[in-house]
A protein has these predicted regions:
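Sec-dependent signal peptide recognition
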Residues: 1-2
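Short, low-complexity, polar/charged sequence segments that are solvent-exposed and flexible
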Residues: 51-53, 123-126, 350
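Mature, soluble, non-transmembrane domains
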Residues: 62-346
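C-terminal motif of bacterial Sec signal peptides marking the signal peptidase cleavage site
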Residues: 7-10
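Start-of-domain marker
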Residues: 12-84
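Juxtamembrane interface at the cytosolic side of transmembrane helices
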Residues: 350-362
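General N-terminal targeting signals
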Residues: 34, 46-48, 317, 346-350
Length: 362
């Protein structure tokens, strides 16, 4: 489990991408990802879904560019170009994959199609949003309403956040709303933040303890000599959890649990369970999912028909927001029908001219 956590911490870039959605006046959409691909994928021009968070299938148009350069080139990258870039990167002690941005773009006819094609692989989880779109036509204007929602993942955790946070505290800690510090001094605001940070650390430790504890109970028959009776072990649940939270905090997933439990119970009877990858697989998966979600960052931009040159929405979707609630990215836009105003003006002018002609004839 420690190795798994260390590996996840070393690949934070694997859970970071850019995502741009453009809503067109005809009600169709364009979606574009900004990705980091390794050298093998750059040269082959084939995206390997097993290596990437963004899962691509279907007719995506792939291009690449050097960071800071607006010129895009078709993927795959030819080997000579790659070698030249690799040499430049060696001189600056960087990597080609950290210097190149790959764009994957695709056009969609409906909100259903774009939602179906959006899949983010985060740990063992696959995140798929619900997307709704409404286009309302009126004589003077057309209104567009777009909403993309990523579902809450609180059911993934053994200990609910409500045991450590109020509803408002959850909102503030994970999304910034409501703002609990707006009327406070800097020192008062810091006190609030430090208190919530401590509660968050306790919640992390409580979850890690609970899933580990349940795994031990499920495999209790495989405990070694010196193990307590199962009834005695159950009776120590609250005491062990309190000790685990106090000692581990936010670093719970990095703990050597076998050593910790040996010190608590003065026996290594549970070491064989805690060190068995098969018996602890569910624990490892949930820890990995939590860490992957904590690293998830999607730089999101939404362009609406009325704001073709500037994004109507520019934000960062963090995976940690999904611990407490769903994350909704939305915007609306109204496009005026210039021709209707021209038509009305022409009608009024025609009526005025007609009235003048009638009066002149009299």
């Amino acid at each position: 489990m420690l190795v798994c956590a260390t590996l996840l911490l070393s690949c934070e870039d694997d859970y970071h991408c850019g995502l741009t959605t453009t809503v067109h006046q005809d009600g169709s959409f364009t979606r574009e990802y900004a990705l980091r691909l390794d050298s093998a994928q750059l040269i082959s021009g084939r995206v390997d879904n097993s290596k990437n968070m963004v899962q691509l299938s279907g007719p995506w148009k792939l291009t690449w560019t050097v960071k800071g350069d607006s010129t895009r080139h078709p993927l795959p990258m030819d080997k000579d170009t790659y070698q030249r870039l690799a040499e430049l990167c060696r001189q600056t002690h960087t990597k080609v994959e950290d210097t190149v941005v790959v764009y994957a773009m695709r056009h969609f006819a409906s909100a259903h199609d774009i939602a179906k094609a959006t899949r983010l692989k985060v740990g063992t989880l696959t995140l798929t949003p619900n997307i709704s779109f409404k286009k309302s036509y009126r004589f003077f204007c057309t209104t567009y309403q777009y909403k993309e929602t990523y579902p809450v993942l609180s059911h993934r955790f053994a200990v609910p956040l409500s045991q450590y946070f109020t509803k408002d505290e959850m909102g503030y800690w994970f999304s910034g709303h409501p703002d609990l510090t707006s009327a406070l001094s800097g020192m008062e605001a810091d006190d609030v933040i430090q208190r919530l940070k401590a509660q968050y650390s306790k919640w992390i430790a409580a979850n890690d303890f609970e899933i580990t504890y349940q795994a031990l109970l499920a495999a209790y028959s495989q405990a070694g000599p010196g193990a307590l009776s199962k009834r005695q072990f159950k009776g120590l649940h609250d005491k062990l959890m309190a000790s685990y939270i106090e000692e581990c905090g936010e670093e719970a997933q990095m703990m050597n649990k076998a050593e910790w439990l040996r010190k608590q119970l003065h026996t290594d009877a549970y070491t064989r369970i805690l060190n068995d990858d098969t018996l602890m697989r569910k624990v490892t998966e949930q820890e990995s999912d939590f860490m992957a979600l904590s690293m998830l960052k999607v730089d999101y931009q939404l362009f609406m028909p009325s704001s073709a040159s500037q994004p109507a929405l520019s934000t960062r979707l963090l995976g940690s927001r999904l611990f407490a609630g769903s994350a909704t990215l939305s915007s609306s836009a109204t496009v005026s029908h210039t021709w209707t105003y021209v038509f009305i003006i022409l009608v009024l002018l025609a009526a005025l001219i007609g009235l003048i002609i009638v009066r002149h004839r009299r």
